[in-house]
């Protein structure tokens, strides 16, 4: 497991975006070889998406041969609702890049048969050859996607009832009105993400510090679902200084001492431009 510690949110976002960019370019995607990328929503990845859009607009990165799979979607919220994750992804990322809409996979929370929708999503991932890099974020309680505390660590894509802490946290997106906040969602399972060849989790802010401590310094525990990634062969946690506040000093010092190695993963930044 790698822990990459940057000074602040902006630098953490940039590091993550550079890593995604380099992974896609090194993969050399093409018409018969698509790169499969798992993606999160929420406030944490916005900075990363902004940088990826910059790399695309500068001609350094193309998503023409990339397939994306989003982590989750609310149940019962229309796709065109401003707070649906479909709207989030198109407004904040997809409409600014050259991805084929048919290759941007987002769960349908209004499907007539929700279980069939979940099963079909898992099948699409298999048909794509699995996910090369799954990018995620976590909540203050350590949940990844909508795998709330107590979720099975081998779970697959399914329908989940949201924890009250999650509903309260999401109320800010619905004018503070709890009655408007969806109480159920479709989500990839912990096992779905664990199947990815590589996982990168973005963790920023002091309010995520205890979750990072649980993920890094304590054992695997289904009450802290992010801890499952201790058992993944290729996990990277990308965080800012604030997120490390609950870690032991020697833990932080150890991983900061490896930054010269970690930075080689993003420097130089590769480009798809001719001659680069």
From Swiss-Prot:
Protein's cellular compartments: Cytoplasm
Record's keyword annotation contains Isomerase: yes
Coiled coil feature spans: 103-131
Domain of life: Eukaryota
Pathways involved: Nucleotide-sugar biosynthesis; UDP-N-acetyl-alpha-D-glucosamine biosynthesis; alpha-D-glucosamine 6-phosphate from D-fructose 6-phosphate: step 1/1
Keyword DNA repair: no
Gene Ontology biological process terms, A to Z: carbohydrate metabolic process; N-acetylglucosamine metabolic process; UDP-N-acetylglucosamine biosynthetic process
Subunit-level organization: Homohexamer.
Record protein name field: Glucosamine-6-phosphate deaminase 2
Source organism of the structure: Mus musculus
Organism taxonomic ancestry: Eukaryota, Metazoa, Chordata, Craniata, Vertebrata
